[in-house]
Amino acid sequence: MTELVGTVTPIRPTPLLAALQALRPHQWPKNVLVMVPLLTAHEWQRWSESLLAMVAMVFAASAVYLVNDLCDLTADRVHPHKRWRPLASGALNPIVGMAMAVVLVVGGLAIAWMVSLSVLYLIAGYWLLAAAYSAWLKRVAWLDVAVLVSFYVLRLVIGAWAVQRPVSWWLLGFIGAIFLALAACKRAGELTARGPEARRGYDAGSLRPLLLLAGSATLAVPVVLVLYSRSSVAAALYATPLWLTAAAPVLAGWLMRVIHIVRIGGMHHDPIIQAVRDPWAWAALAWTLICYGLALEPWR
């Protein structure tokens, strides 16, 4: 039955739909991280700058996806999953893809400049890091995991600079731990699902250390959150910061669920799709937002 499912050919999309798919809109939710500093610093009056910075990040990330797909056309065409991407499958003309990438780069820089020069420089830094990752760093075992986490941390820094607030080390530690766990799970999932061809410098013996790294990062998430809730920083921002600790076990439970999915070989090749399709992920996010609202006590 599995073999039959593997032979199904996806329906060829229309040119417009292919262009949209090439931008990878399913990856856009991670750019919401840019707006997290707005929420944690309570800089509500700067919502427009935060929103513009997020849009600039969407443009920047989509440009990177297009350039990567253009550079990896030959390899993607023989990949079991990537061969169905618009450029690799021929649904989108490479010339159109190049034109789209140029428009996104120019548009992303223009929007970032509207926010501030600092945000523009950070967007440019993101592109440089993405280029280094695609060309070399993604093939360096363990360092690639650190770079993956850096992409998410950089989004937080962009968001903080957009609202003209210093970067919170508490926030960096909290978000960094979550995405360190997910990055380790991503590499471990590739090892269990696709074997040697997907290892990028890892071997069969790397699976256990990757899962241990994911587990350690998962344990760090509630520790950071509990310590933050008892800090003077949280006391100055929240009416009842203790409510934040109620999110800790739920977030840790969801991350442990992700680790379990990796262990049994059920991890999707794209962790973002895995999270979007997982009702437990949405439940953890909803509960975290509820705890955030209760900690604020806006009715006071």
Regions found by a protein language model. Name each.
Residues 1-77, 90-103:
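Topogenic membrane-insertion module of multi-pass membrane proteins
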Residues 2-20, 27, 135, 153-300:
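C-terminal membrane-associated helical module and adjoining short loops/tails
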